[in-house]
């Protein structure tokens, strides 16, 4: 009888210690799973605000830089074109080819004596537009052969004054037209340069939204991959399942194992109590 009593008591203490170890194990796994879930949620909640701030900063800086650089470039281009237009107007006769103008002035001063009193630029433009001798000046830059038709013109001027008047009328209006047409055509070129500068701004501004989409994708994957990977079965199930249900299956398994251990504990306690009463009675 004493042997049965001692065996029952030893069995009772062994079962109690075994159940305590199991309970501590399951409780530790449950606590670890809950802790890992809380860490994941905190990481996922903390990462999107930082990503949004980074995106906003990048977009603002990109847009500001693109707008400033594009507009500054457009303004500089417009100023440069305007300056070039003014230079072209000022040096219509002498700026392009000073040597050619000097040769033209020696070879073809003008068709009549009246046009010599006008400016050199007007004389050069008038002869370049309609004077047949000017074509000879282009083909012969030295101006040797051009002087001969000029002598013929001076002889015809001395013979008849009517021809001189007709030549002055035929030569003077083209100078005015050339002078008036050249400044008007150049502002049109300056105006045409402005839309091209505006068109160069548009692709830079349109490229900003694309850099946003790639930034969002990178931030999301970076936040997911930077988490510490755990090798337990319960955490693998969390990665495979939804975020909301993460840990639900593991908690149910832990609860079922705890229930089974409790049932075993109750059965063994009842058995030991029955044996103890039987022994003592």
From Swiss-Prot:
A lipid is attached at residue 255 (GPI-anchor amidated asparagine). Residues 51-74 are annotated as: 3 X 8 AA tandem repeats of G-A-S-G-R-A-G-A. It holds the Pfam family MSA_2. The keyword Transcription regulation does not apply. Residues 256-281 form a propeptide. Residues 1-20 form the signal peptide. Residues 42-242 are annotated as: Disordered. Coiled coil: none annotated. Residues 44-207 are annotated as: Polymorphic region. May play a role in the merozoite attachment to the erythrocyte. The keyword Glycoprotein applies. Residues 54-76 have a biased composition (Gly residues). This is Merozoite surface protein 2. Keywords: Cell membrane, Disulfide bond, Glycoprotein, GPI-anchor, Lipoprotein, Malaria, Membrane, Merozoite, Repeat, Signal. Sequence repeats lie at residues 51-58, 59-66, 67-74. Disulfide bonds join 238-246. Glycans are attached at residues 22, 36, 158, 230, 254-255. GO terms for cellular component: plasma membrane; side of membrane. It is found in: Cell membrane. Residues 77-133 have a biased composition (Low complexity). The N-terminal region appears to be involved in lipid binding. It is a lipid-anchor; GPI-anchor. It comes from the Eukaryota. Its main location: membrane.
């Amino acid at each position: 009888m004493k042997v049965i009593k001692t065996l029952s008591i030893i069995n009772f203490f062994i079962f109690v210690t075994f159940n305590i170890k199991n309970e501590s194990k399951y409780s530790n796994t449950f606590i670890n799973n809950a802790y890992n879930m809380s860490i994941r949620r905190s990481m996922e909640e903390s990462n999107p605000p930082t990503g949004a701030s980074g995106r906003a900063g990048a977009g603002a800086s990109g847009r500001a830089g693109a707008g400033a650089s594009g507009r500054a470039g457009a303004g500089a281009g417009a100023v440069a074109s305007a300056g070039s237009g003014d230079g072209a107007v000022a040096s219509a006769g002498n700026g392009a080819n000073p040597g050619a103008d000097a040769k033209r002035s020696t070879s073809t001063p003008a068709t009549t004596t009246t046009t010599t009193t006008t400016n050199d630029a007007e004389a050069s433009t008038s002869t370049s537009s309609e004077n047949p001798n000017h074509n000879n000046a282009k083909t012969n830059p030295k101006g040797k052969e051009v002087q001969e038709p000029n002598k013929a013109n001076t002889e015809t001027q001395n013979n008849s004054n009517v021809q001189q008047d007709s030549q002055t009328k035929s030569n003077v209006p083209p100078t005015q037209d050339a002078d008036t047409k050249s400044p008007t055509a150049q502002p049109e070129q300056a105006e045409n340069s402005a839309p091209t500068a505006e068109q160069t701004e548009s692709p830079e501004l349109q490229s900003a939204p694309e850099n946003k989409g790639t930034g969002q994708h990178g931030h999301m994957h970076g936040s997911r991959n930077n988490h510490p990977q755990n090798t337990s079965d319960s955490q693998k199930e969390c990665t495979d399942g939804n975020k909301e249900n993460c840990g639900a299956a593991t908690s149910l398994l832990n609860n079922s194992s705890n229930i089974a251990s409790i049932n075993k504990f109750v059965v063994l306690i009842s058995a030991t109590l029955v044996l103890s009463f039987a022994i003592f009675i």
